């Protein structure tokens, strides 16, 4: 997921978030959706419930970043558009189901609700 925040985080940072939409793209390995989320505990971001609540310029910045972020690796990225909060929730449900089907997965690291 891509979490919208005002301050930097760090790899492995865990926080409670809610989805507000999804950015559809594909790279050389296939579909690579980016579920866009906001932190539940952040009073600045948690009022957003759908991509329509996000500043349109920020949407353009996110899209532009993912269009060019693999250019230096000479890899192609196909931008396939945006989906709403319901589509994001469907993707998360599918991902959660796949995760829950994994045998011998580590327990207690985090939870997906």
For the regions a language model picked out, list residue spans one by one.
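Hydrophobic N-terminal alpha-helices or hydrophobic patches in metabolic proteins across all domains
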Residues: 1-113
